[in-house]
């Protein structure tokens, strides 16, 4: 039979509380450092990239977890257009920063019920606003994702007053999408 743990002393509690507060402060500082400053005027471009099925088999920063040719083309485009204002739409983790460490996962919005996609979209839109990229009316949000990812939430961003662009909306198929990204790189 196991012996119950001894209760913490006041000194141990104080040390744990201090460690917790220091860790929280460090996490907040790291999060704040990832959010770019807001330019004084003009539109603020943000790029949202949809996740892809092909993933590495070990945990990695989100932008390295996805490994398909389509992902590489999307990522290269985002790094040219808005390198400090790029986020990832993840079926498994909602909205993530490219440097967030993610484990491999098998989840897709394809085949999900409308209610589940709507709940996902609510979480994504709510999380997006927390990044504080700037006043909603100045945000131009480019969404690079399949319809099952775009459709549930782009209207929410528009409702908040953001301009939403869907440059790949009429382009069907992975090959034509990669060709679009290649053409943008050449321009």
Predicted feature locations:
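Peripheral peptide segments
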Residues: 2-187
């Amino acid at each position: 039979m196991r012996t119950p743990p001894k209760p913490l002393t006041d000194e141990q509690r104080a040390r744990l509380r201090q460690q917790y507060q220091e860790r929280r402060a460090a996490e907040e500082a790291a999060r704040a450092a990832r959010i770019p400053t807001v330019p004084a005027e003009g539109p603020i471009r943000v790029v949202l990239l949809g996740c892809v099925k092909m993933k590495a088999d070990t945990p990695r920063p989100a932008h390295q977890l996805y490994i398909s040719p389509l992902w590489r083309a999307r990522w290269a485009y985002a790094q040219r257009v808005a390198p400090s204002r790029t986020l990832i739409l993840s079926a498994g983790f909602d909205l993530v920063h490219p440097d967030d460490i993610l484990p491999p996962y098998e989840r897709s919005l394809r085949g999900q019920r409308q209610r589940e996609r709507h709940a996902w979209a609510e979480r994504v839109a709510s999380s997006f606003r927390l990044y504080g990229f700037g006043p909603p009316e100045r945000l131009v949000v480019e969404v690079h994702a399949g319809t099952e990812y775009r459709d549930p939430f782009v209207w929410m961003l528009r409702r908040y007053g953001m301009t939403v662009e869907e440059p790949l909306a009429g382009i069907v198929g992975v090959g034509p999408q990669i060709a679009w990204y290649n053409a943008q790189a050449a321009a």
